Amino acid sequence: MNAKEANFDGLVGPTHNYAGLSFGNVASLSNEKSDANPKAAAKQGLRKMKQLADLGFAQGVLPPQERPSLRLLRELGFSGKDADVIAKAARQAPELLAAASSASAMWTANAATVSPSADTGDARVHFTPANLCSKLHRAIEHESTRRTLAAIFADEARFAVHDALPGTPALGDEGAANHTRFCAEYGAPGVEFFVYGRAEYRRGPEPTRFPARQTFEASRAVAHRHGLREEATIYAQQRPDVIDAGVFHNDVIAVGNRDTLFCHEHAFVDPQAVYDALAASLGALGAQLNVIEVPDRAVSVADAVGSYLFNSQLLAREDGTQMLVVPQECRENANVAAYLDALVAGNGPIRDVRVFDLRESMKNGGGPACLRLRVVLNDAERAAVKPNVWIGDALFASLDAWIDKHYRDRLSPVDLADPALLDESRTALDELTQILGLGSLYDFQR
C-alpha cells in the first residue's frame, strides 16, 4: 500500500528557557541561566516546518505541553492558589520550578517510539510514549504526550496509543531519538533498529561520566509491545565513550532513513557487526543497506556534538535521492562544512543539504532531528489523522500570528517566578487547541 513518512514537529512552548537541566547534554549545560527568546524559538521551528511542507514533505505539528506544571509542583508539596504555588517554589526550590517550567516537550523525537502498520502484529500504527525517567523535567511529559497522540491519532481501528513503560531506571526509554527504521519503500515491511546505552540485566560496557538514558530492556519491551517480527528487529549498543563525550541520544551520532544509515564511525559498539545485522535483515526484505560512515579524521566526535551534524533530518525525495536537513552550526564548523560539500559532490544517496537557523533550540541541545517525530502513514491512515495539524499556508499564518500575540521575546530563569507567565501560557494554549481542533487537551481546560 502507498505510504509516506510524515514528520510531526513540536511547537516550542511559551516558557522556553535555559535552565541547564540536562546533565549529559553539553549545550544545555553550557548555556545555563542565559536569556532565551521564546518567540524566536517558536518561529524558527515553525519556519522549518513550513519550508519542508513547501518542498512536498508531509509535515504536521504537535502542540506544547502546559507549563509550568502546577500538577508537579502540587505533588511536590507546594500548596495554595496557583500564584502561591509558583511563589513558594521559586523561593524554596527554584530548581523544581525550573523543571516544572521546561519547554522540553518541543523535542518530539523523545515523545514516543512509532512503528508503522506494515511492521506491527495487528497492522495498526503503534505509539509508545517515552517515560523519559532519567530527568525530572522530562519524566512529567509522557501522560500529556499520550493524551495528545490519542487526540490526533484517534481512530483505534488504525492507531494504538499505549501508556509509557513503567518509569524505572531498568526501563529507561527516550523514544524515537534512539530508534530508526529501514525499508525499501515506506509502505513495505521494514527493519526496526533500536539503540541503547546500557543493559540493566546484562554485563557490558557503560559510560562513566554521563548517564546512559536508554536501556536494552526498554527497547526490547517496546518492540514486543508493538508486535514486531523478531527477525526484522535489530538492537545495537551505542559506544559508552561517545555518551561521555556528550552524545546523550543516538540521534546525535547517527540518522537513518529508507535504505540509508548515516553515522559516525564511533557511533556503535562493534559497528561492523551492526552493519552486517542490518544488511542481512534488510536484504531478506529485498533491499540493500547503504552505510555512509563518517571517519573520525574528517569529523571528530567533538565536531559532531558541537555542530549536530547527525542530529539532522534525512528525507527521501521523489527522485529516490535523499536530502539532509542540518542546523546552521554545521556551516560554521569548517570540518563539518567541508565534509558536507564533499558528501553532496559525491555519487551517494545524499544529494542535497538544506541549512536552517534553529539557534534557540540548539542552545538547549536540540537540532532538526530532535524537533520531529517520524510517523509512516498510508493513505487511509493519513486521512484518519486530525486534519488541522497539517502544516500549510493557512495553518502557518495562524500559528505565526498566534506566536506574535502570545509569546515573550525574552525569558530568563528568574522570570519563571512571574505568575503572569502561567496565565499567558494558558491563554495561548487555550487558543491553540481551537486552532488545531484538538478539544480540551490540557488539565486547566477540564
From Swiss-Prot:
Keyword Hydrolase appears in the UniProt entry: yes
GO BP: any one term: arginine catabolic process to succinate
UniProt-listed SUPFAM superfamilies: Pentein (SSF55909)
Protein residues bound to substrate: 19-28, 110, 137-138, 213, 251, 364
Pfam families hit by this protein: AstB (PF04996)
Keywords per UniProt: Arginine metabolism, Hydrolase
Pathway: Amino-acid degradation; L-arginine degradation via AST pathway; L-glutamate and succinate from L-arginine: step 2/5
Reactions accelerated catalytically: N(2)-succinyl-L-arginine + 2 H2O + 2 H(+) = N(2)-succinyl-L-ornithine + 2 NH4(+) + CO2
E.C. designation(s): 3.5.3.23
GO molecular function: N-succinylarginine dihydrolase activity
Family assignment from sequence similarity: Belongs to the succinylarginine dihydrolase family.
The protein's role, per its UniProt record: Catalyzes the hydrolysis of N(2)-succinylarginine into N(2)-succinylornithine, ammonia and CO(2).
Subunit-structure text: Homodimer.
Record protein name field: N-succinylarginine dihydrolase
Species, as recorded: Burkholderia pseudomallei (strain 668)
UniProt gene name: astB
